Regions:
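Short hydrophobic/aromatic-rich beta-strand segments that constitute the beta-sheet cores
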Residues: 39, 63-72, 98-102, 119-127
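Short, solvent-exposed aromatic-acidic interface loops
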Residues: 44-45, 69-78, 103-107, 126-130
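Edge beta-strand at a domain terminus
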Residues: 82-97, 120, 124-151
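Acidic, glycine-rich flexible loop segments
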Residues: 95-118
Length: 151
């Protein structure tokens, strides 16, 4: 009986360590994601392909979520006289997936099956309309005045 109790205790400890590791992974992802990223998200609006995107992730202290901005740049003055479409975003890391709500468009996207490092962020993005695309972003240290955009 003592051997069974010991095995049961060890199984419980192993199970608990796995569940805590999952939370730590999400926290680490949110921490690394924090900042500005630029590159090609392969975004299409209408029949126009974005040239590149800039995404800013601002992490809430100690949480797996935050707010930010997502700007898609297009060739020419495509959108209401601008060469970009700007969105405020909210985001959450849950079970290693990154869930993003584009507040100004009222759309949701999910980033999954990705590689995230200090300088490069690549993987797949799935929009709520069923479109799936590979993306590749790089850490951007430029300073942006986010208030200059038409929201």
């Amino acid at each position: 009986m003592k051997k069974f109790t010991t095995l049961l205790t060890m199984a419980f400890i192993a199970l608990m360590s796995i569940s805590f590791t999952s939370c730590d992974d999400d926290s680490d992802i949110a921490y690394t994601l924090d900042g500005t990223w630029e590159g090609n998200m392969l975004v299409e609006y209408g029949n126009h392909n974005a040239l590149y995107s800039v995404i800013r992730f601002d992490q809430n202290d100690g949480f797996y979520s935050g707010t930010g901005y997502w700007i898609d740049y297009y060739k020419g003055n495509y959108w209401h006289g601008n060469n970009y479409i700007a969105n405020h975003i909210t985001w959450t890391v849950r079970n290693r997936n990154i869930y993003i709500t584009l507040l100004d468009e009222g759309r949701d996207v999910v980033i999954y099956d990705y590689a995230l490092g200090d300088r490069k962020f690549s993987g797949y993005v799935d929009a709520d309309n069923g479109n799936r695309a590979y993306f590749e972003l790089y850490r951007d240290y430029d300073s942006y005045n986010w208030r200059d955009y038409d929201w």
